[in-house]
Amino acid sequence: LVAGTAAADLLAERLGIDLPDDRDYATAAGLALATLKRLPEEGESFALQGWRFEVVDMDGRRIDKLLVSPAG
């Protein structure tokens, strides 16, 4: 379980994923928004570089928690 406010760089390092150098986000929530290109609803998920990210909690229009697990 990852907080939306978690640093994207640290998350990428721990998961072994590559983030674009020219990205305009710094958090896990920003990564989700950049990937989905819209505000998600609770329960939505996406896959990225072998990992599944599920939005498990929204606080209004803010992504509060993401569940990250191996895609498969």
Show the residue positions of the predicted features.
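Cytosolic regulatory modules rich in charged/polar residues
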Residues: 1-72
